[in-house]
């Protein structure tokens, strides 16, 4: 049987308000992660590693940095007809923006008609995980379903925070799609677990087009993939679930198999970054068999400067990117993006520093996220006194993480 023709559609229009101020000037999928990456690099790496090389990224809010990253990083071979391209709202159906995720695809159906795929893979743009989507596509073709929804096994007590999939006794046919239910249904054979929707879908093309047209004609719809399109197909008994726990990615360890994180809040974003710094992180960035791909800035290697025991540049349990200079300062359990400088006697602890942050002499940064080009003057502190951080206008999360937006100079 010949391989199906697959088109990837990545939904990247989210505003990411819960990640503010990190999303003040960028779309959520463009938020940096892990030192070198952007959140969108994870889904694009999964699709490209699987050989799916025709991908449209549907964008909307504050998309400039996202568009620039995609066009400069994700360049495919035009000779072979491959592409990864950002597609902003085109207003093809009238003078309006996307009204929801389903409307974004409906307004972009010309992409589907032009490519003429057998299968359309619709994935979200802002989760951290590895996945081989070929296995999900294979199950979809074998099952004969109109849509297959990726399901993540979570404890029933956690299912209240997700859209939840209720299956038939066969464990595969979807009987109901429930939005944040008070009493999530258990799984056949595993009653204390439930399927949370990962927001990843595989559609047979004709089924997708028909569902989008019907949804567009429904004046009561909010035009959402999870809220409208999937329930429509569930009612037609045309929806199946794909158990993400069975997805085997080359090179994965026992610990990171099945890893998937929604980093839509400051605290979940920070926690996922800190996991990378652990002695034995759950998510392994260093899997060469299924790499997370991105563009690497042309900067020199990281440098650690010391001139004796009184002034020693050190970094422990940390990710240190190229172009970083730790000049006599101390870094612990932190993620440092390219171009960061930590000056003499400064302390950086349990912190994320994005590109070109400057930490001055004797400064202290703790339990914080500093966006690009932030300047911490000599002797200044951030993240040490949360009440003072709030008084200075900085965001402090529920779990006490101080977030400072782009280009800010920390006040004394």
Curated annotation (Swiss-Prot):
Entry keywords, A to Z: ATP-binding, Carbohydrate metabolism, Glycogen biosynthesis, Glycogen metabolism, Nucleotide-binding, Nucleotidyltransferase, Transferase
Pathway terms, separated by semicolons: Glycan biosynthesis; glycogen biosynthesis
Enzyme Commission number(s): 2.7.7.27
Catalytic reactions of this protein: alpha-D-glucose 1-phosphate + ATP + H(+) = ADP-alpha-D-glucose + diphosphate
InterPro entries assigned to the protein according to its UniProt record, in alphabetical order: ADP-Glc_PPase, ADP_Glu_pyroP_CS, GlgC_bac, GlmU/GlgC-like_hexapep, NTP_transferase_dom, Nucleotide-diphossugar_trans, Trimer_LpxA-like_sf
Chain residues that bind alpha-D-glucose 1-phosphate: 163, 179-180, 197
CDD domains: ADP_Glucose_PP (cd02508), LbH_G1P_AT_C (cd04651)
Disulfide bonds: none
GO biological process: glycogen biosynthetic process
Pfam families in the cross-refs: Hexapep_GlmU, NTP_transferase
Single GO MF annotation: ATP binding
Function: Involved in the biosynthesis of ADP-glucose, a building block required for the elongation reactions to produce glycogen. Catalyzes the reaction between ATP and alpha-D-glucose 1-phosphate (G1P) to produce pyrophosphate and ADP-Glc.
Record note on quaternary structure: Homotetramer.
NCBIfam families cross-referenced by the UniProt entry: glgC, PRK00725.1, PRK00844.1
Protein name: Glucose-1-phosphate adenylyltransferase
């Amino acid at each position: 049987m010949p391989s199906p023709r697959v088109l990837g559609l990545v939904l990247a229009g989210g505003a990411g308000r819960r990640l503010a101020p990190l999303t003040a000037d960028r779309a959520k999928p463009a938020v940096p992660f892990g030192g070198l990456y952007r959140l969108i690099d994870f889904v694009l790496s999964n699709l490209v590693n699987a050989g799916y090389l025709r991908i449209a990224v549907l964008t909307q809010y504050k998309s400039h940095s996202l568009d620039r990253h995609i066009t400069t990083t994700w360049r495919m071979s035009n000779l072979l007809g491959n592409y990864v391209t950002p597609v902003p709202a085109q207003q093809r159906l009238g003078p309006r923006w996307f009204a929801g995720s389903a409307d974004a695809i409906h307004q972009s159906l010309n992409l589907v008609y032009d490519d003429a795929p057998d299968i359309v893979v619709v994935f979200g743009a802002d989760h951290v995980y590895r996945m081989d989507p070929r296995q999900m596509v294979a199950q979809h073709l074998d099952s004969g379903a109109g849509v297959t929804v990726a399901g993540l096994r979570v404890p029933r007590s956690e299912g209240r925070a997700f859209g939840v999939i209720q299956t038939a006794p066969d464990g595969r046919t979807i009987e109901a799609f429930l939005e944040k239910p008070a009493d999530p249904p258990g799984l056949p054979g595993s009653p204390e677990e439930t399927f949370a929707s990962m927001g990843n879908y595989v559609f047979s093309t004709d089924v997708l087009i028909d569902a989008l047209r019907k949804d567009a004609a429904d004046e009561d719809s909010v035009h959402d993939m999870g809220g409208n399109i999937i329930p429509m197909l569930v009612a037609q008994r045309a929806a199946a679930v794909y158990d993400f726990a069975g997805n085997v990615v080359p090179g994965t360890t026992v610990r990171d198999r099945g890893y998937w994180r929604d980093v839509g809040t400051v605290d979940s974003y920070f926690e996922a970054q800190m996991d990378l710094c652990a002695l034995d992180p759950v998510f392994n960035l260093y899997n060469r068999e299924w790499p997370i791909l991105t563009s690497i800035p042309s900067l020199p290697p990281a440098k650690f400067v010391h001139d004796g025991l009184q002034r020693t540049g050190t970094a422990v349990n940390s990710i240190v990117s190229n172009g970083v200079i730790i000049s006599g300062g101390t870094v612990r359990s932190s993620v440092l993006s390219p171009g960061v400088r930590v000056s003499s006697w400064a302390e950086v602890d349990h912190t994320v520093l994005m590109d070109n942050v400057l930490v001055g002499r004797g400064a202290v940064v703790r339990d914080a996220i500093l966006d690009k080009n932030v300047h911490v003057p000599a002797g200044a502190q951030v993240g040490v006194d949360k009440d003072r951080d709030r008084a200075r206008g900085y965001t402090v999360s529920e779990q006490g993480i101080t977030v400072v937006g782009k280009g800010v100079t920390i006040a004394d």
